[in-house]
UniProtKB/Swiss-Prot annotation:
The gene is dnaJ. It is found in: Cytoplasm. Belongs to the DnaJ family. Binds 2 Zn(2+) ions per monomer. PANTHER family: CHAPERONE PROTEIN DNAJ, DNAJ HOMOLOG 1, MITOCHONDRIAL-RELATED. This is Chaperone protein DnaJ. It comes from Rhodopseudomonas palustris (strain TIE-1). GO terms for biological process: chaperone cofactor-dependent protein refolding; DNA replication; protein refolding; response to heat. Zn(2+) 1 binds at residues 148, 151, 201, 204. The keyword Chaperone applies. CXXCXGXG motif repeats lie at residues 148-155, 165-172, 187-194, 201-208. Participates actively in the response to hyperosmotic and heat shock by preventing the aggregation of stress-denatured proteins and by disaggregating proteins, also in an autonomous, DnaK-independent fashion. Unfolded proteins bind initially to DnaJ; upon interaction with the DnaJ-bound protein, DnaK hydrolyzes its bound ATP, resulting in the formation of a stable complex. GrpE releases ADP from DnaK; ATP binding to DnaK triggers the release of the substrate protein, thus completing the reaction cycle. Pfam families: DnaJ, DnaJ_C, DnaJ_CXXCXGXG. Zn(2+) 2 binds at residues 165, 168, 187, 190. The keyword DNA-binding does not apply.
Length: 379
């Protein structure tokens, strides 16, 4: 009896009383996970895959399962129970649906045609807040792979043509029998293209593409935000051997603005005002994103941090007629470098001040006095 083989039930990760439906479900899940084509270059996956196949071939058959439950792996050694000769045939039918799941995508890619879609490209573009407000058309230059004109994208030297791969017959994939199961792999001779090039084009060295600088116009709509993505269909890399081109994706980032901070469609700015304007009230002008100006009126007694809303002076909303607002936050600036006369006037003002002129300060110091008074009276 073998001492190296793992229990078939453990291999399929099921209980010994598992029914046929549970066995099949477990088998499909593990086969998809460990299939060598999904784990290229990993020999352990191939070993694991073989173990899964062997376990399922035994446990799905009522007679073989009964023999295994009674005698273990010894039931199939030294010719026992047919010497395991029936595994190969059973494999093909058991795995037909698995292969459809694994290789269905390959069939849709145009197996045997050799055509491949070009890669998508990414281009990072920084724009100003004004650009996002108004919208613009920008010109960009990018290096991109285009179809080689010398060979029309075939990769073969002028006057010659690619030949159908003799290894796979143009299918792009080959099947290889390994014991009781068959693996389908990418053809090693043509790398899945279905064609081979004996005399490559000297301009593109057989790739069918060359790199060139391309100038493109990018339409940036009003209201774009940081991180907005713009897709230019068909402006990516050229496809291989007549395949369709990829797409170009423009990723926008907004440069920091000297005056405004953006929050969605709203704009925010901080404006310093004099102590006199804050105390007596008044008005001042602020710039707007459309390079205009607007007036902001402040009431008397305005404190630092107060915000004023200016409706409709924010950013346009992308693909909408809506427009955000602009918020102006005032910062009361304390005067510096006072003259002697100014100092005297402020000192006189301080003497004339009462609790009504500085309610927050009076309230704060009253709380401080109360706090220390309560500590002094504590036992």
């Amino acid at each position: 009896m073998s001492t190296t083989k793992r229990c078939y039930y453990e291999t399929l990760e099921v209980e010994r009383n598992a029914d046929d439906s549970t066995l099949k479900s477990a088998f499909r899940k593990l086969a998809m996970k460990w299939h060598p084509d999904r784990n290229p270059g990993d020999p352990q996956c191939e070993i694991k895959f073989k173990e899964i196949n062997e376990a399922y071939e035994v446990l799905k058959d009522g007679d073989k399962r009964a023999a295994y439950d009674r005698y273990g792996h010894a039931a199939f050694e030294q010719g026992g129970f047919g010497g395991g000769a029936g595994f190969g045939a059973g494999f093909a039918s058991s795995f037909s649906d698995i292969f459809e799941d694994l290789f269905g995508m390959a069939a849709q890619r145009g197996r045997g045609t050799g055509r491949e879609r070009g890669a998508d490209l990414r281009y990072n573009m920084e724009i100003t807040l004004e650009d996002a407000f108004k919208g613009k058309t920008a010109q960009i230059e990018i290096p991109v792979s285009v179809t080689c004109e010398a060979c029309s994208g075939t990769g073969a030297k002028a006057g010659t043509k690619p030949k159908t791969c003799s290894t796979c017959g143009g299918a792009g994939r080959v099947r290889q029998a390994q014991g009781f199961f068959t693996l389908e792999r990418t053809c090693p001779s043509c790398q899945g293209r279905g064609q081979t090039i004996e005399d490559p084009c000297p301009s593109c060295t057989g790739s069918g593409r060359v790199t060139k600088e391309r100038t493109l116009s990018v339409n940036i709509p009003q209201g774009v935000e940081d991180g907005t993505r713009i897709r230019l269909a068909g402006e990516g890399e050229a496809g291989l051997r007549g395949g369709p081109p990829g797409d170009l994706y423009i990723f926008l980032s907004l440069a920091n603005h000297a005056i405004f901070q953006r929050d969605g469609a709203d704009l925010h700015c901080r404006v310093p005002i004099s102590m006199v304007t804050a105390a007596l009230g008044g008005e001042f002008e602020v710039p707007t994103i459309d390079r205009g100006k607007t007036k902001v009126k402040v009431p008397s007694g305005t404190q630092t941090g107060r915000r004023f809303r200016i409706a409709g002076k924010g950013m346009p909303v992308l693909r909408s007629r809506q427009v955000g607002d602009m918020y102006v936050q005032v910062v009361v600036e304390t005067p510096q470098n006072l003259t002697k006369k100014q100092q005297e006037l402020l000192a006189e003002f301080e003497k004339l001040s009462s609790g009504e002129t500085q309610p927050e300060a009076v309230g704060f110091f009253s709380k401080v006095k109360e706090f220390f008074g309560s500590r002094a009276s504590a036992p």
